[in-house]
C-alpha cells in the first residue's frame, strides 16, 4: 500500500530516479525533487524568523495548498565538536586517559539561517502533499540525509 501510494505521488509530480533515493532508514527526496513538487502544486509559503543568531536559527514555514494551511519549523545549529578527557580501561585493565569527541549541532555550514529556511521549505512541502505521512524526508533536513 505504502509503496503503491509513493509510486502514484512520484508519477503525479514527475519525479525521476535523480529526485529520490533510499537512505539507510528512509526514502529521501532531493532538493530538486521538492522544488518540482512545490512548483506543480503552486504551494504558497510564508516564512517567519523565530530565532536568528550567529550559530543557530529557527524558521517557521506556513504553507497553503488549496484550502489547507499547515505550519512547521526548520532549524539549524552550526556543527561543533566538544572534546573531553575521559578515563577508560586498557586491555590490561589499567585506567588511561582517552579523548571523547561529541558532535553538537546539525549543520556543517556557517549560513544557518538559510539552512533553517531550506529545512522548513522541505518539511512544509512534504507535509502538505502527503509525503511525510508515508515516512519520506527531504535531503536538506539532516546532514546525514545527503546522497552517498
Model-derived features: positions:
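Polyanion-binding surfaces on beta-sheet-dominated domains and ring/shell assemblies
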Residues: 1-148
Amino acid at each position: 500500500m505504502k509503496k503503491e501510494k509513493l509510486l502514484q505521488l512520484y508519477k503525479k509530480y514527475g519525479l525521476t530516479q535523480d529526485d529520490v533515493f533510499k537512505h539507510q532508514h528512509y526514502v529521501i527526496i532531493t532538493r530538486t525533487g521538492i522544488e518540482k513538487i512545490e512548483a506543480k502544486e503552486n504551494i504558497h509559503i510564508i516564512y517567519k524568523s523565530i530565532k536568528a543568531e550567529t550559530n543557530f536559527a529557527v524558521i517557521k514555514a506556513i504553507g497553503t495548498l488549496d484550502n489547507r494551511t499547515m505550519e512547521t519549523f526548520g532549524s539549524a545549529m552550526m556543527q561543533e565538536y566538544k572534546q573531553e578527557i575521559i578515563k577508560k580501561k586498557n586491555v590490561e585493565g589499567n585506567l588511561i586517559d582517552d579523548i571523547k569527541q561529541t558532535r553538537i549541532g546539525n549543520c556543517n555550514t556557517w549560513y544557518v539561517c538559510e539552512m533553517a529556511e531550506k529545512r522548513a521549505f522541505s518539511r512544509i512541502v512534504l507535509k502538505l502533499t502527503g509525503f511525510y505521512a508515508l515516512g519520506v524526508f527531504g535531503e536538506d533536513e539532516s546532514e546525514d540525509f545527503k546522497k552517498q
